[in-house]
Amino acid sequence: MDNNFKIKDLPKNERPQERLIRYGAEVLSNSELLAVILRTGTKNQNIMMLASSLIKETGGLDQLFNQSIEELTKIKGIGVTKAVQILALSELSKRFKTYKSGNEYKINTPLDVSNLVMEDMKYLKQEKLKILILNTKNIVKYIRDVFIGTLNSSIVHPREIFCEAIKKNGASIIICHNHPSGDPTPSKEDINITLRLKECGKLIGIDLLDHIIIGENKYVSMKEKGTI
């Protein structure tokens, strides 16, 4: 059983839900906010203890929100239901961070790209390649994952990249991929892929504006490095 201790079993002045109602969500700690979402503890831990240990065990909210359902359910006290709640909360937080009024996100600098994809990519355990398709005003109209796995120029085919841009009537594209090591320093393959896509873009009239490599809370822009 994983529902022996509930929020209502805590003293009223210690219940995070009561504190939120009385004082506002901003006064609650991360553990308290997580406790409000998860609601129930375990046989040996009340919900506050469980929420606190969960954040500590995973290394903080960033790491917690990048766990897979398999990883979460290996943690003592976390079943499928709680894992699903955490994953849903994680996805909402990522979407909110990239939300813009009117659902428009304009790219002016490489930092704008990083802000858009960092939360989703910085802790991935495999390399993932994303394509951002922009209109003539540099507003992101479409984002798609086009490849997962070790990137090299023989696998990443320009046809797959630019086919999406053509379908969506894109004026230009930006590609992003992550380095699971956390170090965004470009490899020779990264540079080769960038140059190949740049030349293909020129031929078909859809410019490659940048190639952003994501590390752990840092990034490298091929445009800033002069590769593009």
Swiss-Prot record:
Domain of life: Bacteria
Keywords: Hydrolase, Metal-binding, Metalloprotease, Protease, Zinc
Cysteine pairings via disulfide bonds: none
PROSITE patterns for the chain: MPN (PS50249), UPF0758 (PS01302)
Motif range (JAMM motif): 177-190
Keyword Metal-binding tagged: yes
A matching Pfam family: UPF0758_N
Record-linked Gene3D superfamilies: 5' to 3' exonuclease, C-terminal subdomain, Cytidine Deaminase, domain 2
Domain MPN span(s) in chain numbering: 106-228
CDD domains, A to Z: MPN_DUF2466
GO biological process: proteolysis
Record-listed Zn(2+) binding positions: 177, 179, 190
GO terms assigned for molecular function: metal ion binding; metallopeptidase activity
Family stated for the protein in its record: Belongs to the UPF0758 family.
Protein name: UPF0758 protein CLI_3057
Native source species: Clostridium botulinum (strain Langeland / NCTC 10281 / Type F)
